[in-house]
Amino acid sequence: MSAANMPAGFTDYKVADISLAAWGRRETIIAESEMPALMGLRRKYLAEQPLKGAKILGCIHMTIQTAVLIETLVALGAEVRWSSCNIFSTQDQAAASIAAAGIPVFAWKGETEEEYEWCLEQTILKDGQPWDANMILDDGGDLTELLHKKYPQVLDRVHGVTEETTTGVHRLLDMLAKGELKVPAINVNDSVTKSKNDNKYGCRHSLNDAIKRGTDHLLSGKQALVIGYGDVGKGSAQSLRQEGMIVKVSEVDPICAMQACMDGFELVSPFIDGINDGTEASIDKALLGKIDLIVTTTGNVNVCDANMLKALKKRAVVCNIGHFDNEIDTAFMRKNWAWEEVKPQVHKVHRTGAGSFDPQNDDYLILLAEGRLVNLGNATGHPSRIMDGSFANQVLAQIFLFEQKFADLPAEKKAERLTVEVLPKKLDEEVALEMVRGFGGVVTQLTKQQADYIGVTVEGPFKPHAYRY
């Protein structure tokens, strides 16, 4: 749909350039062909309209793949209002195509922090007043937190929240433990078809792409340090190894550390004997002085701290593929060092003091996406086939919570329903099956004898809840 086809009088949006809508529509059509699970759900549930009456507040990266998600939710009966969960991740053509379809969206690439907060507010507000929303779809937890702190009255009507990423799940669990969470939540992040696809295989595809687009560097033969070896770290380490880099890994969890060793990565610590006492003396300068690229992947704070940044090799590339920009101590970098913009989302950070700098100085770091998500800041994120699993899970989670009708329960029953849970394994398998069919794969069916032997049904689920894929 082009801007010319926008519903007459529709102004409930703010995007960078509405004239990009036709471009966004062309890319969305291609993405649909690469998202068999999501489009399969659209076809399967279209007649049933399971989200009829759902009013969804959405905050997730406003990409082409998200456009397919939004239009699937709408096709299944929902109304939505949307914003992006990151100031750099919006693809402006995608936002324009959604606005041109008459769907409220507030997102553009390169928002300021103030503009980001404004966009979150506009997601919640319609005509200046809180919209009568009854569902939340979030990525990172900013929208959920804003609703709890500033618009708690909206939550009286909300049936639940579906959360996309590790960081947001951590925030939900913290709120639940403190008794602050007002609605039930589905942890989409830990569905197997999300965590293994998006977190691992997606990062394997998109990290090296972003670094090469941002720097035009050859990565082969250079040394990389990946901070963290969860699913995101695993995919990131593989991504860099594919480029021929010499990859080292730093980890705090002995199990993940063991996996790194078993996968053939050298396990190191940026700190002498692995102990960070907060001083420069604890830094392994010999290690960091050889590192050409450092990537943070943890969802934790200051895992690349000021002392590490001081010790890195001259002209090293620094980037983050975790959700927030606090994994790298960019606050220290802004306060103490001079920033030179090379191009959007690429800065030379001169370690010669704050203020002015000598353009010929060679003691600098190359910081990508200002320490925010590098794969969406410097590239276009994960491919459609990867996001297919994540967003199919989001649709199923929205349907699941909407049908539970938490907001309509009597007060005495609500307390026991305030949980943060993953989707039932049967739904995870449903998403996986549609993805396999999209690859042209054929899944073998158990015989009744085989199913009985291992204690499952022929239709599944096929693994116990505790199984680790």
Swiss-Prot record:
Needed cofactors, names only, are: NAD(+)
Q: Name one GO cellular component term.
A: cytosol
| Annotated keywords | Cytoplasm, Hydrolase, NAD, One-carbon metabolism
Instruction: Provide the binding site for NAD(+).
Output: 165-167, 199, 228-233, 251, 300, 321-323, 375
Annotated localization: Cytoplasm
Give the cofactor note text: Binds 1 NAD(+) per subunit.
- Answer yes or no on keyword Repressor: no
Q: What is its EC number?
A: 3.13.2.1
Q: In which pathway does it act?
A: Amino-acid biosynthesis; L-homocysteine biosynthesis; L-homocysteine from S-adenosyl-L-homocysteine: step 1/1
Q: Which reaction does it catalyse?
A: S-adenosyl-L-homocysteine + H2O = L-homocysteine + adenosine
Which Pfam families does the annotation name? AdoHcyase, AdoHcyase_NAD
Q: Which SMART domains match?
A: AdoHcyase, AdoHcyase_NAD
Q: Which GO terms label this protein's molecular function in UniProt?
A: adenosylhomocysteinase activity
UniProt-listed GO biological process terms = L-homocysteine biosynthetic process; one-carbon metabolic process; S-adenosylmethionine cycle
Q: What is its main location?
A: cytoplasm
Domain of life, per lineage: Bacteria
What does the sequence similarity comment in the record state about its family?
A: Belongs to the adenosylhomocysteinase family.
Instruction: Outline what the protein does.
Output: May play a key role in the regulation of the intracellular concentration of adenosylhomocysteine.
Name listed for the protein in its UniProt record: Adenosylhomocysteinase
Species this protein is from: Pseudomonas putida (strain ATCC 700007 / DSM 6899 / JCM 31910 / BCRC 17059 / LMG 24140 / F1)
Tell me the gene name.
ahcY
